[in-house]
């Protein structure tokens, strides 16, 4: 999805086959990841489909879990739950002298919501459980036809923003746009 999750995934995940990673990049379309993997799974049911999203972006598309359950579309979603809009909050630290506006998220258990919709829900609160939980979820997806939501409980530390220029005046290269702010 968009935000720091996308930046980290793009920097560290490696794939052996083309068309294995879809990302919104800097378009800012929050809630992109989950619907995208649902479409990818329908197109290629023989391949695992995994999305990564922060808790803010996840809240925009999590109801599609029910769509997956109802229509037998097995996917895996990994939700990083740090109870805040991390990228936005970091920009407020860097550009607005720690004046926080609408950066906090008070969210329920996403794994619990997934279970209430008929999917599997796994809560991970220890780093050493991330790998085994992901393997279990992908196994359920590929061998049992189940959708699984992995909720990773994260610290509230703020990472570097994925776009340091997010609040800077853009550089205009074409003359016709130079007068625009």
Across the structure, where does each feature detected by a protein language model lie?
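A short acidic, glycine-rich active-site loop
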Residues: 23-29, 97-105, 181
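Short gly/pro/ser/thr-enriched loop/turn and capping motifs at secondary-structure boundaries
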Residues: 6-7, 28-30, 58-59, 83-87, ...
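Active-site diphosphate/adenylate-binding microenvironment
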Residues: 1-35, 40
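Glycine/aspartate-rich loop-and-adjacent alpha/beta segment that forms the canonical ThDP
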Residues: 11, 136-181
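Conserved thiamine diphosphate
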Residues: 43-136
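Short acidic, glycine/serine/threonine-rich loops at helix termini
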Residues: 9-14, 35, 62-64, 87-92, ...
């Amino acid at each position: 999805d968009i935000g720091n999750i996308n930046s980290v995934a793009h920097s560290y995940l490696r794939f052996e086959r083309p068309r294995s990673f879809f990302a919104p990049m800097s378009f800012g379309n929050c809630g992109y990841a989950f619907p995208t993997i649902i479409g990818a799974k329908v197109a290629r049911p023989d391949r695992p489909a995994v999305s990564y999203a922060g808790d803010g972006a996840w809240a925009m598309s999590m109801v599609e879990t029910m769509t997956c359950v109802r229509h037998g579309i097995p996917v895996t979603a990994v939700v990083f739950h740090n109870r805040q809009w991390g990228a936005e909050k970091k920009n407020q630290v860097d550009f607005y002298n720690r004046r926080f506006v609408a950066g906090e998220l008070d969210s329920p258990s996403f794994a619990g919501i997934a279970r209430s919709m008929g999917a599997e829900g796994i809560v991970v609160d220890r780093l050493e459980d991330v790998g085994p939980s992901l393997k279990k979820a992908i196994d359920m997806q590929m061998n049992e036809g189940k959708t699984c939501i992995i909720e990773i409980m994260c610290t509230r530390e703020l990472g570097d923003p994925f776009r340091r220029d997010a609040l800077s005046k853009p550089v205009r290269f074409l003359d016709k746009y130079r007068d625009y702010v």
